[in-house]
Amino acid sequence: MSARVAVITSSYPRERGDAAGHFVESEVKRLLRAGHDVHVFAPGAGSTESNGATVHWITDRGAFGWPGALARLKERPTRWLGASEFCARASSALRKQRSFERVQAHFLLPCAWPIALNGDRKSELELVGHGSDVRLFCRLPRVVRTRIARAWLARGAKLRVTSRELADALGAATPELSSSLSVEPSPIDVDEVPTRKLARHALGISETKSVALIVGRLIPEKRVALALHALSLLDNLCAVVVGDGPELESLRARFPDVHFAGHLPRPETLRWIAAADVLVSASAHEGAPSVVREARALGVPVVAVPAGDLVAWAERDPGLLLVRPE
């Protein structure tokens, strides 16, 4: 049955090719395919129509966007004012439109709380945790976590997280939520990605060249240097890094033979994945990494370290090899 659905998110593509919140956009597309009337409430500015959904852009004064809210707020603390303004305006917009049968809030903070609780109490409430938002929630004082959890439960909210690791962490931090939790990785969309041959042709890569690809934010937690050091020990292998971050210049200096492509639009990133012989990840802090799922969906082998749900995935996927750094 078709329903009017509100999707609240602090991350959503503002233009074609924008990688921010692409997994939320995939959720919206799934709702649209099911015949629902979808309204997205997101920070920033852009087109008011996206793939058939109505988008309500809300002022945030630069608080949200790439490379993520926490990084942006840490970089410039005055952006907290913009984050507060987004919460107030999004809550107001939700209150004004009380005809949604269903509200889907992505990111536990600030969308599931406090924004989603300001909508019509008759709306079905679905809350989705993705990663850093869940870990931030788990670090809140116990009394605050309990208060928020009880508010969600009082509304009959259904909670979904994208990995078993996140479910375990959330259940341990707030046991009262355990019975309401489900695990489901975010949908991914690789339908328009070119074949390996076409991707290599577009990127100017010969069929005989072996390419190892790393995709991600260049921060210490991702351990890109560890991955590049391991790749440097292999002969006749071209290493490519897609992504940006504070470690970029030091990595360039340390690994001069590596091609650093920088931060790319999502279609270009997916083209690189399709063209690669292997995707490599040395990050030990992952739940259900989208880039690994995208690579496997495109038939690209993955070498990674044991982290999050990768351990369970590797048991049933011979194309996912886990190694432990020595």
Predicted regions and their residues:
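Conserved donor-binding/catalytic core segment of Leloir-type glycosyltransferases
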Residues: 160, 206-222, 228-232
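Short hydrophobic beta-strand element within catalytic cores of glycosyltransferases
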Residues: 301-304
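Short alpha-helical donor nucleotide-sugar binding micro-motif in glycosyltransferases
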Residues: 263, 271-276
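Nucleotide-activated donor-binding/catalytic signature segment of Leloir-type glycosyltransferases, i.e.
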Residues: 249-267
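Aromatic "clamp/platform" in nucleotide-sugar-dependent glycosyltransferases that forms part
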Residues: 284
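N-terminal subdomain of nucleotide-sugar transferases
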Residues: 1-57, 232
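A short helix/loop element that forms part of the nucleotide-sugar donor recognition site in Leloir-type
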Residues: 143, 193-205
